[in-house]
Structures are given as C-alpha cells and as structure tokens.
C-alpha cells in the first residue's frame, strides 16, 4: 500500500497543531496577540520550517502594518523558545529552525469577496434602474 502523504507533510501537520497550542498557551507577549498558524512549509530534510501566521486583531481592528511587523518580530524573537517547546512536544531528532511569515491570504480573500459582493449589488441596481447609468 502506497503512502498517501510524505513524512514531511505529516510532520508539518503535526507541527502546525503543536505550534498553535504553544502560541495559545505559552507565549505571553502582547505584541503577538491572537496569532493563528495558517500553514507550514517544511523542507524535505526537516531542518527548516516557514510558519505562516495570521493575527486576528489585525482582521478586526483594521490595524496598521506596524502591528503585523511587531507581531512577526515578537514571534521571531521567541522562535528559540518555541523551538525548544516544539522539540519536547514532538520528540524529533532534528527540530526545524523556525522562521515566521505573515499570511495575508485571509485578508485578501475577504477583500475579493467584498469586491464580488459590490459588483453583484451594482449589477442588480443596474437591472432595476437601467436608465440611471446612461445619464451619468
């Protein structure tokens, strides 16, 4: 029976769960806020991991880009501690070196959804009032 997923995919899924728990329970830095792990890119040799995070406070507050930069900086500063806790939780021979990156796909998805909603709303308005657009 062939393996459905490679080892690096299985490890990255487990690592995503563990890092999410660590961020939720262990990291007390206020700059991090409510960070969620949206994905992990793991190298084939499991030596490097790029952790993609989103910040829920950025989604709700329309926060400035400095909030994101400060959050990523705080996570990068705590990466050694997170790596230590990850090593204890997962019992890997080699714990990957962690780098954190902001994942803006959720915000972009919301922006695209709003654009589509506005276009549909404008289209419905044009169908109801067909002559009002030509006068403008």
From Swiss-Prot:
Summary of the function given for this chain in its UniProt record: One of several proteins that assist in the late maturation steps of the functional core of the 30S ribosomal subunit. Associates with free 30S ribosomal subunits (but not with 30S subunits that are part of 70S ribosomes or polysomes). Required for efficient processing of 16S rRNA. May interact with the 5'-terminal helix region of 16S rRNA.
GO CC term (a single one): cytosol
Subcellular location field: Cytoplasm
Organism placement in taxonomy: Bacteria, Pseudomonadati, Pseudomonadota, Gammaproteobacteria, Enterobacterales
Name of the molecule in the record: Ribosome-binding factor A
Top-level taxon: Bacteria
Assembly behavior: Monomer. Binds 30S ribosomal subunits, but not 50S ribosomal subunits or 70S ribosomes.
Family membership noted in the UniProt record: Belongs to the RbfA family.
Name of the encoding gene: rbfA
